[in-house]
């Protein structure tokens, strides 16, 4: 029913200035403040705002026709600007839309918005912002759509709007009824009300219910829905030659042998890459191996050099949080912690199909940044963005990996060279060796106790490589303005603001390999360090770990929510600091993107291996749009966090990142999963909050704290190993 021409015009009216104003993202909104940003107190205020991830939806919210269309049987098709990567966003937004549209939940069909036919988010899908960011605009759009139906129904039925009632997508008055589809027939000029009236949340039928996933059947039956499934008629296959050494620069390539191999259509040589296009995937991969490339490589790096590089005191520093005086004196306790390089290791490797025609390019891809993918392809082709249509697919795991899509550009270049669609799939080796890794970190924690056994001071000094810096999501000026990487500082703030003297100091080091976004960003490593140290201070003070923490949390709104999460976790888990039957409990808590979370774990040691038996998760996500999906996210965070904390690490060996395949890259297996994950949800506010990443934060420290009580050993480096 949407008027595509008028919709496109309305989308183009969203000027750059309006985009920045609507964005609400502190990083963008502060640009007008100018030189005041370079004053440290203001910087720290902005960093705190950015760290809360209070990001509004960055896209058009004034035209329901970009979002909704009507299908047969009165089905409403919702074009989602957020991609589905297993987090359940499609289900949550279907619930939100159904309530305000006043249609049955099963009558809402959610599809990915393409850049040609729907509204797209100019930011990304990530940062735990999909449901929280769409909560207000999507409901308003749905309410507007409902009111548009009522206006036209009143015209067709010859009654006033006040005489109408709406139920299940049917508008009625005086014994006559019209479905939304019947109302829309023949209407070309819609009246869009300026201010929709939202329903009272208490009247919602679907929000707050544990409804089944809308994509469940497709996944069970194996529908072709992922990037690797994407196909186009007459499709060829591409492969790209990549260096095995860190920092290698392309010099030249000899392609004669590859050009003569079976199935090869063309070898595409560019200044920045060499690719092969062939009739099959295997033929493209085989020909790639036959290309002789000359690389300029630096001296072979080794792991110990990376460790030395990633040490507090190296690089540039910025104070991101400061209250009171710095810690000095003989009574100051100091400990160090480290986390390793981490891979995304998502199940589905990156894949893309690109078809570049004379004046139109079509890209089918697993991407978390639909708009950025479009801009990068159009820029490389030298075209206007309107000439590139990006069709996002379902993602077989995102975790931040698909915030980078240079392979879309490479596939487009290869397609243009051969005049046919080209499918480019990463091999597993490519996926591991050329990942955008989670950077390694080093932390120094300092603390002191007063005569009452309470913290008089707490400091966190840490170093990290790039997370948000140098990514397409953030303008290059942002690091200069903020003085810190907005991703690296996630979880780095001292949440125990009742400590009179506390500070957090960030150090940045440029690493020789690519690092970037990884699920929860800096939260996992920062929480591991801070919460392990706080637990050590509780032991030193001779106090219960939970009670010790509660004594240092303020009673503002955020503090009260954190306290409630901590207390509830202890109660639900039956937290005890006694070792019973060879098992011990550990506790940790964190606040991420405004969502507090606490874990209590129960562990044992079997053959010098740490075994996690039970995890109790207490999360306060605010209003739970779909409680079952939130529990699933908590369970997923526990398993992913356990895997990272107990097993995963990449290393630099002779100038290369290794390993490059599952198996040697250790990950948690089914046998390592806890027998029980108990999730308790609280509601400390009346709107949805972040969910996809906050539950990942506490797991590492909780395990380490349990191991300390069980064995007496303080494990200070991930992955946690007793030998």
What are these regions (language model features)?
Residues 2-723:
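Cofactor-binding beta-sheet edge motifs in enzyme active sites
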């Amino acid at each position: 029913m949407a008027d595509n021409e008028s919709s496109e015009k309305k989308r183009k009216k969203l000027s750059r200035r309006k985009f920045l104003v609507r964005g609400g993202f502190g990083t963008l909104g502060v640009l007008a403040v100018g030189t005041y940003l370079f004053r440290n107190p203001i910087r720290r205020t902005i960093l705190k705002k950015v760290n809360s991830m209070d990001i509004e939806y960055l896209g058009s919210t004034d035209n329901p026709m970009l979002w909704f269309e009507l299908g047969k049987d009165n089905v409403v098709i919702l074009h989602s600007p957020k991609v589905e990567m297993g987090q359940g966003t499609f289900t949550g937004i279907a619930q939100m839309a159904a309530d305000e549209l006043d249609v049955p939940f099963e009558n809402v069909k959610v599809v990915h918005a393409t850049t040609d036919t729907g509204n797209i988010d100019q930011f990304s899908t990530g940062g735990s912002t999909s449901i929280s960011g769409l909560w207000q605009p999507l409901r308003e759009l749905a309410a507007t759509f409902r009111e548009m139906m009522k206006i036209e129904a009143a015209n067709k039925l010859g009654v006033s709007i006040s005489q109408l009632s709406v139920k299940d997508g049917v508008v009625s008055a005086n014994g006559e009824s019209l479905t939304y589809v019947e109302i829309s027939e023949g209407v070309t000029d819609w009246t869009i009300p300026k201010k929709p009236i939202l329903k009272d949340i208490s009247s919602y039928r679907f929000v707050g219910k544990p409804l089944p996933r809308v994509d469940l059947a497709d996944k069970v039956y194996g529908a072709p829905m992922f990037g690797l499934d994407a196909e186009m008629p007459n499709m060829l296959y591409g492969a790209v030659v990549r260096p095995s050494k860190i920092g290698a620069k392309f010099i030249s390539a000899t392609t004669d042998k590859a050009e003569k191999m079976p199935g090869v259509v063309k070898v595409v040589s560019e200044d920045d890459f060499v690719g092969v296009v062939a009739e099959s995937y295997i033929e493209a991969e085989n020909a790639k191996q036959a290309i002789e490339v000359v690389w300029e490589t630096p001296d072979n790096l080794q792991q110990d050099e990376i460790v030395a590089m990633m040490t507090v005191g190296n690089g540039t520093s910025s104070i991101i949080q400061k209250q009171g005086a710095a810690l000095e004196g003989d009574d100051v306790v100091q400990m160090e912690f480290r986390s390793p390089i981490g891979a995304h290791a998502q199940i589905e490797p990156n894949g893309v199909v690109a078809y570049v025609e004379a004046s139109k390019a079509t890209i089918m891809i697993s991407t978390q940044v639909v708009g950025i993918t479009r801009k990068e392809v159009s820029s490389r082709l030298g075209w206007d963005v309107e000439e590139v249509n990006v069709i996002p697919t379902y993602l077989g795991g995102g975790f931040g990996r698909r915030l980078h899509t240079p392979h879309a550009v490479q596939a487009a270049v290869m397609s243009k060279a051969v005049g046919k669609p080209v499918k480019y799939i990463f091999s597993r080796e490519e996926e591991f060796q050329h990942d955008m890794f989670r950077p390694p970190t080093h932390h120094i924690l300092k603390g002191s106790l007063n005569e009452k056994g309470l913290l008089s001071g707490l400091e966190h000094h840490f170093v990290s490589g790039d997370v948000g810096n140098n990514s397409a999501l953030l303008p290059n000026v942002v690091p200069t303005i903020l003085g810190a990487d907005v991703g690296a500082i996630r979880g780095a703030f001292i949440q125990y603001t009742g400590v009179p003297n506390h500070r957090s100091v960030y150090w940045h080091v440029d690493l020789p390999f690519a690092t970037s976004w990884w699920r929860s960003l800096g939260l996992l490593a920062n929480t591991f360090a801070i919460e392990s140290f706080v637990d050590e201070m509780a032991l030193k003070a001779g106090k219960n770990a939970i009670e010790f923490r509660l004594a240092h949390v303020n009673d503002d709104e955020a503090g009260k929510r954190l306290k409630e999460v901590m207390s509830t976790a202890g109660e639900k888990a039956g937290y005890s600091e006694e070792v019973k039957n060879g098992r011990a409990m550990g506790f940790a808590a964190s606040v991420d993107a405004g969502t507090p979370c606490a874990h209590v774990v129960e562990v044992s040691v079997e053959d010098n291996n740490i075994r996690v038996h039970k995890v109790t998760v207490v999360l306060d996500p605010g209003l739970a749009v779909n409680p079952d999906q939130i529990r699933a996210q908590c369970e997923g965070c526990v398993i992913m966090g356990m895997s990272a904390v107990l097993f995963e690490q990449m290393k630099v060996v002779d100038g290369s990142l290794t390993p490059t395949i599952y198996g040697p890259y250790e990950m948690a297996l089914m046998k390592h999963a806890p027998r029980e994950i108990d999730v308790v949800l609280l509601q400390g506010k009346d709107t949805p909050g972040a969910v996809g990443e906050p539950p990942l934060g506490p797991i590492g420290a909780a395990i380490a704290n349990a191991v300390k009580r069980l064995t007496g050993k303080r494990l200070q480096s991930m992955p946690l190993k007793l030998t």
